[in-house]
Amino acid sequence: MYAGFYVAVHPWLETQSLHKVGHTGNLAARLHDGSYTTCFTDEWKYCFTLETPTKKDAQKIEAGVLYCAQFFRVKNKELLCLLPEKIKQLAEDVAKCLDISYTLCDSPTYEMNDSTIVVEPSLPSDPLISKEKLRHLVIIPVEDEDHFADDVLFFSTDETRTAIEDRLYQKEAANMGYQELQRSGRAILQMACRCGKTRVAYLILSNYLQGKVLYLVPGLSLLRQTLEKLYLYGISLKNVLLVGSDQTRIVLNHDNIEMTTNPVFIAKRIQEASSLLVIATYQSSTLLVDDFDLIISDECHRICGEWEIRPFTHVLLNFKKGHRLFLTATPRYDTPLSMKNRDLFGGVAFRYYLREGIEAGYVNDFELQMVAAPKLAHQLSNREETTKQIIVKQIIMALAYLKTNITSPKMLVFTRDIKQAKELYAELVDLGVYALIAHSTLPRQVILKTFTEFCSSKEPVILLNCRLFQEGVEVPELNAVFFAAPRHSPRDIIQSICRPLNKQVQKPHATIFLPLEVNTENVCLDKFSSIIPFADALASEDPRFYEHLLNPSEVAYPINWIGAHGSVSELLHLARHAIRYGTQGKIDRLTRSERLPWKAAFAELKRTVEICCRYPKINDGFHFGGATLRFDTWYKWVIKSYLQYKNKEPSSLEPYQVSDLESLQDWTTRGVGGPYPWEESMAFLETWLAQNKGELVAIDIHQGGWIGLDATPMERLSGVLTTVSQRDGRSYGKNKKLRPKKGFMIPPQQAEDLDRIFGKHNLKWRKDRVNGFLKEDEHGNYTGEPTCIQEAYRTFKEYVKTNPEYIEKYWPGYAKGKHKHQELPHIWESGLAPPRYKAFKDGNKQLIQRSPKKKDVKN
């Protein structure tokens, strides 16, 4: 038997450029065991193996490869989106660094017989490897094309200085961003592409112009664009310094200004100025000195990556002075240096969704078109060639679809790499399709010429690229984008989607094409796996898409198929099912608390507080997008995350969400602490007993007080003592069978408080016990001496009949059923209360409307 590290491929994965890595003590048998044959056909094969002396050595190589390729790994899977040659080189480098001997076998085959089938011994799931030894091997996603485009493509606007009316959300963003800067010194503004982040930045930096402001951008073109916009907003060039490598003078109306990279001049200008605005590229930031009151980092997701000093991280990691404002549409959380680091980046002070920009009319709308795999006339020689031909035909179908509505459509095609772009370009040109190609290995002049030709074309045209035009490039007439290869990064997906969404008069909606290797003859959930990352990214920016996935019959969304023969509705149903439940179809991925759209869930919380005058109850239900949810689950998650945030622990909440919560009435007391605050109620109890000669008088421990925000101290005390009475023993065991009450679930500190307060007046609050069991009869009724709480409840029941004035004074609204329904009478009668959530043993869930006329609203 051969032990070793391996890279395997299956046709279903190959279409997505995914490769399986693993280790085994038996290379001959590995691809034949259940984990490979249960859910896949028997078409697995090894790309290569590294045969090792032991299985443990192979496991270390696998762990090292997964660590070094972490940015190309499918989450929680041993799948890498890398070419086999790249993985092979990485595996060999890892083995050498870990001093593991190996034998490399390319495209190996191993004989399988009965003697090779043995049970492998298990190993610890997390082998100990030195990550420090491997850190230099970590593969960082190459973004050279992004930065290259920044410095090649720039089209000046025709705007002139005019009065600009700020949009309402821009004012709100500026206000919340500035407040968070004053509070913590750091703030992130997460705003969708094309929604005016620069204007918001201007509104904020205007508060700092008496001092020094640094505005960092990721390229020369964006530097010019930012300068133009700030100039239009009213910034004077007299107090502006541009730091960048382009010596071309920039002319704005009658003003002009030059960039510089002279370190002596830059340092002197910054240090001597009392007020100054510096606009610089990240690449030139090493020329700056640390002397700013505010530092704005535009497109700040580009700062993220490996934790090391480089031009993009220089200011972030080295500068100590000033407040920090970070602007992005797509935060990045999947790198060692990421925006999860609250100490460096702060949190999101304001968020503006892509869908909000569309509905407000600032961003062009779009439709999703999934493109089915066509049938090929002839069976091709290999899988790679087949996949290429299918994608070519899908691109042609997409262009034909556009031409039915647009005379001269323009479509960007995003490819996996430059190699794929070249191959598709050659095929399309051979077929007579007007296609262009641009990539970072071409001369700058060629790229600019190609881009100009694409923008000015009067014919239907396709432009193939890998990442060159993914960010920051304006193509006003662009109509569509086509993903020729799956993308897994939410940042890449959203940035690509936004390319054709610039708003123009009479511009038709844009189209996003998602090709799938699916047709009506080969439908299975696995073939939808490539769209799951896309759908997750889009759902986070578009709550309407999220709701559509939950309930397509009630929430329409522009999503369809082209090239599909047969039941399009069935294909759409399968696609939605794969997105919601995954390709295994087991777990509802969309209804977890952290996935619920914040605005919708918070709106229900706010409605409950403001309309119903209370915080959620444990059995409140929530009907969202067709899903039947228990609102208390989300509410508890919010409270837990809020407390983590306030304790400066890792939290799922961002500052803008915390601000939303703290805007609610009594959030920090009733919202977080609950309707029955212990210390407050104990203080009232102590005062009450002192004023009433040690008599509790009357307490309601049946309906549990009143949970409303307007509750009287006596109503809150009733709720507290109800829980005390309930916790002093339980009457039922499992399966609802009667048993002696033995439980005592009152926390020790609370028991001490009750002993101290009631003890002052010789009042008995504990129930009688024998050998730890409550005294009770055969029917489970308590037979011990009544406690002072029970006596007070008897008095309460008498007063309901004989002393209604007393009841109304301390339990207002009791006679109208307020306490019985735990709702204000007018809320109960009008049906405004949240529905009651009920789950059944068979898995069904139901929301029952709380009102005089109950009716089911969801089954």
Swiss-Prot record:
A molecular-function term among this protein's GO annotations: hydrolase activity
Q: Where is the Helicase C-terminal domain?
A: 394-553
Top enzyme class: hydrolase
Q: Which Pfam families match?
A: Helicase_C, ResIII, T5orf172
Enzyme Commission number, as recorded: 3.6.4.-
Give yes or no: UniProt keyword Nucleotide-binding. yes
Alphabetized InterPro entries for the sequence = Helicase/UvrB_N, Helicase_ATP-bd, Helicase_C-like, Helicase_Restrict-Modif_Enz, P-loop_NTPase, Phage_T5_Orf172_DNA-bd
Question: In which residues does the motif DEAH box occur?
Answer: 298-301
Q: Where does ATP bind?
A: 191-198
Q: Does the keyword Electron transport apply?
A: no
List residues of the Helicase ATP-binding domain: 178-349
Q: Keywords of this protein's UniProt record, alphabetized? A: ATP-binding, Helicase, Hydrolase, Nucleotide-binding
Q: Report the sequence similarity comment from the record.
A: Belongs to the asfivirus helicase A859L family.
Q: What is this protein called?
A: Probable helicase A859L
